[in-house]
Amino acid sequence: MINMAGESVKYTSGVHANYDIAFRIDTAGLNFTDGQAMPKSPKTISDAEGLSISIDGGVEEWNPMDGEGWTRRLVTAKSITISMTAKRNSGDPGNDYIAGLFMKTGSDCYSFFDIIFPNGDELGIPCVVNVTSLGGDSTAIDAMEFEILSHGKPEYIKGSASV
């Protein structure tokens, strides 16, 4: 299978460690082709240590008279937040790109992030990058923390190993 970055990726079944998850940030920012977000210059982010994916559903609820006191609900919106931690690695294109966004605002923080799961599934996310922390203790390695926040609807592609 070929991923969004145009690379061939081998997939296997079974249980996997988190380090088997591949991810990339588009260092060219967010680009659109025919109204679709398309990555132009995807790069890995070297020395990333942690990746946590959260999905938030906007839920509307109401209490109809015929519900006999029971609440009804409907998920009307979704968003994805990916929280990441990394060591600052100067000279790595992905790491430098993220660190370079720490003082940026507005559309300068738009990008495209894609995740390739070990089973071959791929999640492509038009996003906003929010750098939340740089630095650390005097004897620690320079740290970097950031969030990838979905900006519009992501694309989910089932991989060849998916059921």
Give residue spans per PLM region:
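Short acidic, S/G/P-rich loop/turn micro-motifs used as interaction or catalytic elements
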Residues: 91
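Generic macromolecular interface patches on structured domains
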Residues: 94, 157-158
